[in-house]
């Protein structure tokens, strides 16, 4: 590899690296000073990357709860059928700072089993 080619490659890699670093949304958008716990029936569940999600209606409000990635869910014993629509669960989490219908979930209790997601 010539010096010019190497410099070009390194410049390209450096230019693309910040995009990869911010591609994941992170958890900074959730207010950890306002934790809550709710119990309800799962209306819909999504078991795919980047994060699994469940939707529930609590006291007339429709919520979207962001869970862990599928690989972590599987390692902790939470399979798609465990969080399927129609199941009842309890979640503990933090509300999103700008989306009032979304929350990040720290742990879920389903089928009598408490599972830490972070």
Place the predicted regions along the sequence by residue.
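Conserved hydrophobic positions within beta-strands
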Residues: 40-42
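OB-fold/S1-family single-stranded nucleic acid-binding modules
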Residues: 97-118
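N-terminal export leaders
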Residues: 6-10
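Short boundary/loop segments of OB/S1/cold-shock single-stranded nucleic-acid-binding domains
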Residues: 22-34
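Short aromatic-glycine-enriched beta-strand elements
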Residues: 49-56
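Short nucleic-acid-contacting surface segments enriched for D/E, G, S/T with interspersed K/R
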Residues: 75-90
């Amino acid at each position: 590899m010539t010096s010019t080619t190497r410099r070009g490659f390194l410049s390209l890699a450096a230019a693309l690296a910040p995009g990869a670093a911010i591609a994941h949304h992170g958890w900074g958008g959730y207010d950890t000073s306002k934790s809550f716990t709710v119990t309800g029936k799962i209306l819909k569940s999504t078991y795919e990357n980047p994060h699994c999600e469940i939707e529930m209606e609590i006291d007339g409000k429709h919520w979207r709860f962001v869970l862990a990635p599928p690989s972590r869910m599987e390692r902790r014993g939470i399979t798609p059928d465990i969080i399927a629509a129609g199941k009842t669960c309890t979640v503990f989490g933090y509300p999103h700072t700008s989306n009032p219908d979304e929350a990040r979930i720290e742990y879920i209790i389903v089928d009598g089993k408490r599972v830490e997601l972070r």
